[in-house]
Amino acid sequence: MILTITLNPCVDNTFWVDDWDSLPVKTERQSGGKGINVARVLTNLSVPCLALAPAGGENGALLRELCQSERVPLVPYPIRGETRDVDTWVRRRDLEQRVDVHPSPEMTREECAGFEDLALSLLDRARAVAVCGSACCERAAQAGRRILEAAKERGVFTVLDSNKTALAVCSEAKPDLIKPNQKELAQLMGRDVAPEEEEEACEALLDRGIGSVLLSMGAGGAVFRSRGSQPVRAAAPRVETVNAVGSGDSFLAAWLHAWTAGASSRRALEWACAAGAANAAVFPAARVTRREIQEQAGFSL
């Protein structure tokens, strides 16, 4: 089983409009947050998984309902704060988007301790744990770090796919795999990273004690780097991009699927790039299927 940890879940609301000053002609909702997205795609790929996330208020109840309807195996941890909304407005004629991210809830010290305890109780059943996305607060980021540290002590494969405060804090746990995009790689390095410097930056992360680096570059493909091996590169299939949101989550889910299947580093990277491209070609986010990935990859796992 793969356990995903979403430190800042949301209800994703998509409003389709004819123009920015017009009322929506269609509204769509789905569960959101990077770990939840990863779990949705893992489920589509028949990989056993659980998605642990804090959930509070009316939106927390809605999140649980949405996950149930989407077959996302959510393990909700109740908190007093209100789970956030993320509103995306899409103009139908050209698919241009505007996004409004609502405030995140705070988690109390007691809530974070309970969340950690629940995560640790699930680790005994896990082959891998992936801490994903932003953190709703500093305490939640620290909880994510401690969960990764505890998982490493138990021999569970640890993955970090995060940003901002959560990336800075959780990377201190030196996970077995970190999956930055180019912006997050720059954050980790504390400076801009030119394309010709990316492999050197990945090597620097390995020198810090991180086990391996999976650098996703969107349409530019991806690089996998681990200690004692040559970098592996894969190109991204060419698609007409409709919606890039969720492509990184689909990428990671497909890589984890390949990892559980024992695929080679190259095959896993190609499968992951195909999943990211398949997601970018469709609405809504992070719902790609094995068939859609296979069509982009030209092979199946």
Q: Whereabouts are the PLM-identified features?
A:
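Conserved phosphate-binding/catalytic region of the ribokinase-like
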Residues: 168, 196-301
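Conserved N-terminal subdomain of the carbohydrate kinase-like
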Residues: 20-21, 44-127, 295-301
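Hydrophobic anchor at the start of a short beta-strand
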Residues: 2, 47-50, 74, 158, ...
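Structural motif
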Residues: 1-3, 97, 127-128, 212
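Short beta-strand-to-turn element immediately C-terminal to the catalytic PLP-Schiff-base lysine
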Residues: 17-18, 90, 223-227
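Short acidic, glycine-rich surface-loop motifs adjacent to enzyme active sites
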Residues: 123-137
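Conserved phosphate/ATP/ADP-binding segment of small-molecule kinases
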Residues: 141-229
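Glycine-rich phosphate/adenosyl-contacting loop at the front of the ribokinase-like
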Residues: 1-52, 60-65
